[in-house]
């Protein structure tokens, strides 16, 4: 009985003691709003999920953008190939015409030599030396007659040798002309074939882009929505973290750990490395500003009036011909700017105006800074497939037809034209335009390439793990962290310093 009473008293005492604990929990819940049914949107798990969502959308955009860039640069390559084939055909035609003139000259030489030989033979026959011996009055006449005969024989042999040489030259030139004709015919066929390939590549790119346009827009919208949601949650998180500081001291709650945000920097661009400094390895840490020098950079205008656009509406052949026409004009602009740049440095211009990197090392840094200054002046200019030439942004082709801007290789073409370096409008060709440097040793002013054989993308390394690029359709010229994914093992250096 005593044991039962004691047990009952214990249970009652426990329930009474539990009342303050329950009341305290309810009070804390009321003060801090932490009901079990309300999930904290700024919780670490939610933030991590949203960050992963943004990263996933970025990755998808990067992959699709890479596929589109590859297709676009394939068209740029095809157009460059057309230009090379047409140049080869024109050179072969000039060689053929020179060969034909050579054959005509050889025929004329044979005809002249034959006439001289015929005249000599007739004179010898009519006035042969046989009667001279009979009419000679003294031995001296005989000696003179003999000498004259020997001279005539030597002259005859000389005329005959010239005739034979002329005939041999004729045969050689006719053979060379035949080879030139075959070469010209093959070059013409190659030019036609390369044009067909370019047309096919352009049509394929048009079809591919049209098919991918919807997906590109969907992914861009998905990425924008995910980023907006992440920004909103981060804002809520920042507001929520400030609330506990205002709570009454009488009812302190354990301080919540700050929500882990993997990257507090601005939202990454598609495919960007979260830590460009770590990714940079041994890349230079040169400051992004121009090197200290006595040059007055303000007097070097990095732009020129825009030259006519490459875009022509209509069939692909018209587009290709227009692009090649603008390339010719762009080359002349490059030559003019090359002369101007060298004159600014106090160096006599090259005969053609094209420096093609042949700039004295003592002026190399100034040249690199001028190239970069030209590029940085275009930040914010839209991406335009096929856009960009030596004078600045231009309307592109197909999807870039309505946009004045640059594509990746067009931006590099524009930047280096300022110092007289002529580049093709194709990243793969630009990759082979200078000295290859291991990417771990790249420095300010080197070109960075992406994709197999540099066929996908090109950018300019600025130093400190940053690069200048015209990345993809829908974007614009901007500075981005260097991406190592897909990078070629070498960068290209056009200017030494």
Swiss-Prot record:
Summary of the knockout phenotype: Essential, it cannot be disrupted. Depletion experiments show cells grow as long, branched chains that form clumps. Periodic septa and DNA segregation appear to occur normally along the filaments. Has increased susceptibility to carbenicillin, a cell wall-targeted antibiotic. Depletion effects are reversible.
Output the InterPro entries linked to this UniProt entry: NLP_P60_dom (IPR000064), Papain-like_cys_pep_sf (IPR038765), PG_Endopeptidase_C40 (IPR051794), RipA (IPR049836)
Compositional bias annotation for Basic and acidic residues: 177-192
Identify the domain of life. Bacteria
Record's signal peptide:
1-39
Naming one, the record's GO cellular component terms include: extracellular region
Compartments reported by the entry: Secreted
- In the UniProt entry, which residues are flagged as the active site? 408 (nucleophile), 457 (proton acceptor), 469
Q: What is its EC number?
A: 3.4.-.-
- According to UniProt, the name of this protein is Peptidoglycan endopeptidase RipA
Biological source species: Mycolicibacterium smegmatis (strain ATCC 700084 / mc(2)155) (Mycobacterium smegmatis)
């Amino acid at each position: 009985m005593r044991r039962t009473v004691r047990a009952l008293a214990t249970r009652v005492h426990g329930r009474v003691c539990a009342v303050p604990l329950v009341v305290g929990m309810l009070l804390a819940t009321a003060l801090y709003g932490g009901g079990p049914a309300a999930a904290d949107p700024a919780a670490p798990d939610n933030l991590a999920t949203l960050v992963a969502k943004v990263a996933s959308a970025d990755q998808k955009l990067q992959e699709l953008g890479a596929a589109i860039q590859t297709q676009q640069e394939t068209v740029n390559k095809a157009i460059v190939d057309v230009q090379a084939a047409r140049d080869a055909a024109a050179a072969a035609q000039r060689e053929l015409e020179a060969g034909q003139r050579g054959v005509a000259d050889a025929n004329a030489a044979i005809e002249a030599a034959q006439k001289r030989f015929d005249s000599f033979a007739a004179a010898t026959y009519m006035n042969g030396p046989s009667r001279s011996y009979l009419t000679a009055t003294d031995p001296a006449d005989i000696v003179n007659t003999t000498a004259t005969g020997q001279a005539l024989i030597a002259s005859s042999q000389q005329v005959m040798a010239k005739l034979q040489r002329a005939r041999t030259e004729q045969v050689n030139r006719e053979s060379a002309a035949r080879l030139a004709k075959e070469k010209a015919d093959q070059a013409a066929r190659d030019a036609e074939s390369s044009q067909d390939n370019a047309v096919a590549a352009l049509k394929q790119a048009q079809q591919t882009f049209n098919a991918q346009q919807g997906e590109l827009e969907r992914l861009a919208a998905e990425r924008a929505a995910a980023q907006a949601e992440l920004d909103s949650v981060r804002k809520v998180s920042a507001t929520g973290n400030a609330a506990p500081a205002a709570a009454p001291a009488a009812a302190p709650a354990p301080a919540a750990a700050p929500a882990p945000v993997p990257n507090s920097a601005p939202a990454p661009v598609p495919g960007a490395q979260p830590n460009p400094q770590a990714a940079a390895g041994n890349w230079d840490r040169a400051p992004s500003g121009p090197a200290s020098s006595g040059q007055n950079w303000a007097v070097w205008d990095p732009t020129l009036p825009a030259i006519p656009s490459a875009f022509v509406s209509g069939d692909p052949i018209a587009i290709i011909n227009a692009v090649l026409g603008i390339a010719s004009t762009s080359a002349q602009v490059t030559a003019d700017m090359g002369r101007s740049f060298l004159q600014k440095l106090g160096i006599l211009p090259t005969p053609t105006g094209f420096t093609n990197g042949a700039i004295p090392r003592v002026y190399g840094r100034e040249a690199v800074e001028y190239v970069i200054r030209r590029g940085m002046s275009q930040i914010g200019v839209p991406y335009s497939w096929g856009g960009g030439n030596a004078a600045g942004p231009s309307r592109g082709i197909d999807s870039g037809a309505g946009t004045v801007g640059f594509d990746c290789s067009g931006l590099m073409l524009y930047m280096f034209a300022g110092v007289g370096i002529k580049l093709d409008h194709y990243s793969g060709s630009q990759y082979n335009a200078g000295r290859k440097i291991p990417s771990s040793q790249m420095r300010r002013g080197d070109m960075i390439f992406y994709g197999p054989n540099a066929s996908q993308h090109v950018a300019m390394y600025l130093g400190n793990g940053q690069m200048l690029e015209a990345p993809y359709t829908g974007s614009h010229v901007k500075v981005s962290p260097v991406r190592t994914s897909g990078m070629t093992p070498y960068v290209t250096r056009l200017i030494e310093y």
